[in-house]
């Protein structure tokens, strides 16, 4: 769970992940690089908030709920919900570089961790396996575009994800061996993407 921690006392100052990014964007402007994008511009806040609710419910949370359900009907409900949302995102990203237009905003930050884990963890282990992220051309190139930004790629550790989800994860998969998969190949994230050229003005 992301959190802001007071490094002198060790106390958690804030762990409300629903509000954390927007609070950082609004309350820490003096500490943000002047060339960093405004991830929560005032004129887009209502639309950003609405999209964040959709992404959370239909993707970020839904992939975890699909793994935690105990019956086929509920599993299929979340499965269908996830892939309907991925289809919707694929269409949205066919028209613009980022989720809210031509610059990175809060929804891009919120969706990235789930995208980074999708083929590696959710597709395989959580049985959310209709399509892989790489099977969505716009969504895949968008994810690689984000990853090529050091703020995303520089903080993404695929090996740690493997270990966390396959070896130390405590979700109800006791019947599965605790093996850390060798794949998929992480180097595909370094392949060029077409987003900048596709949406250059």
Locate predicted features.
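C-terminal alpha-helical interaction module
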Residues: 1-201
